[in-house]
């Protein structure tokens, strides 16, 4: 391992293996997350990303490989790590019988130099339900409270599992702003999410995990950068014969159904492609409600890498 990694990496995973009932859900995974950066870990359900993060949090014991968090073993040196790491679980992991503000103040008292609780209450809009018990909170409210609890101790590293799940747009923006602030303060953020726009907006580095391994990684720009590939998105009034459009455009372009009456065309999309699509629509007396051309998105790349079948 290069010497620079020892300084820059908050998380270092090498050859991680974890099996359940003889089946490897993590199969020789390598991953690094740098300090002062947001690392997004993406993958379909069952890809192994949650198990990987749980090994980093000391919640699971690896069957093989090494995991180092802030240079320490999360299993044998958990006592030293706990004050330095914040964890936000997707299910919250919060005691349900206490009031929201009481819980956050209790967590803050566990740390030597916590954030101001009042500041977090204001930033994340916790005041409206401060005196409500956790069991009565909505999913989005629980997520905001769990995030506050994860960052109140001023961690050097924070793990965020689906941080904006169930949130309205205003709450989600507040969460994103706080994540950016943490990064700017030098905190390492490891983010798992199914929201591609969240990863595109926040991540400095993206790792795509599938079948227990990292199958692609890099910045969002690196992953979507293909000078020739563009995506045409088409939505029509009524039914759309996706197979017929694909035959008309030829094998050089990929035409994919994207819901009722819509599709995407991926490849070397240019003016001739747009002309061919509009000519085909006119020939079939089909009205386009929306036709846009743009760069490939992270979601396009993710689906190309992991497939489109349900898991």
Residue spans for each PLM region:
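Short, surface-exposed acidic/glycine-rich loop or hinge patches that mediate macromolecular interfaces
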Residues: 72-75, 214, 239, 268-272, ...
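A generic structural signal for secondary-structure junctions
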Residues: 86, 108, 112, 225-228, ...
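ABC transporter nucleotide-binding domain
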Residues: 176-268
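Solvent-exposed beta-strand sheet faces enriched in polar/charged residues
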Residues: 14, 235, 292-294
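An acidic, carboxylate-rich microenvironment
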Residues: 64, 76, 80, 102, ...
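C-terminal coupling/interaction segments
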Residues: 2-4, 269-311
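ABC transporter nucleotide-binding domains
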Residues: 8-11, 18-210, 216
């Amino acid at each position: 391992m290069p010497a620079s990694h020892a300084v820059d990496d908050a998380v270092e995973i090498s050859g991680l293996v974890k099996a359940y009932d003889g089946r490897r859900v993590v199969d020789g995974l390598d991953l690094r997350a740098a300090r002062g950066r947001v690392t997004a870990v993406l993958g379909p359900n069952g890809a192994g990303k949650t198990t990987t993060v749980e090994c980093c949090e000391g919640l699971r014991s690896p069957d093989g490989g090494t995991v180092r968090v802030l240079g320490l073993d999360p299993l044998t040196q958990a006592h030293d790590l706990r004050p330095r790491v914040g964890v936000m679980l997707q299910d919250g992991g919060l005691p349900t019988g206490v009031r929201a503000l009481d819980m956050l103040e209790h967590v803050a008292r566990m740390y030597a130099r916590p954030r101001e609780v009042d500041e977090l209450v204001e930033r994340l809009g916790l005041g409206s339900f401060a005196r409500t018990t956790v069991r009565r909170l909505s999913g989005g409210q629980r997520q905001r409270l769990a995030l506050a609890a994860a960052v109140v101790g001023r961690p050097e590293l924070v793990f965020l599992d689906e941080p904006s799940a169930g949130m309205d747009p205003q709450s989600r923006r507040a969460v994103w702003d706080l994540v950016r602030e943490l990064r700017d303060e030098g905190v390492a953020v490891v983010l798992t999410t199914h929201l591609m726009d969240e990863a595109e907006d926040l991540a400095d580095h993206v790792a795509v995990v599938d079948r227990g391994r990292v199958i692609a990684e890099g910045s969002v720009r690196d992953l979507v950068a293909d000078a020739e590939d563009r995506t045409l998105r088409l939505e029509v009034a009524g039914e759309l014969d996706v197979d017929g459009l694909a035959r008309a455009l030829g094998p050089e372009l990929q035409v994919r159904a994207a819901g009722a009456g819509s599709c995407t065309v991926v490849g070397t999309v240019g003016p001739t492609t747009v002309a061919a699509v509009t000519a085909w629509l006119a020939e079939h007396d089909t009205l386009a409600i929306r036709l846009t051309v743009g760069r490939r998105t992270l979601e396009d790349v993710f689906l190309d890498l992991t497939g489109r079948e349900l898991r």
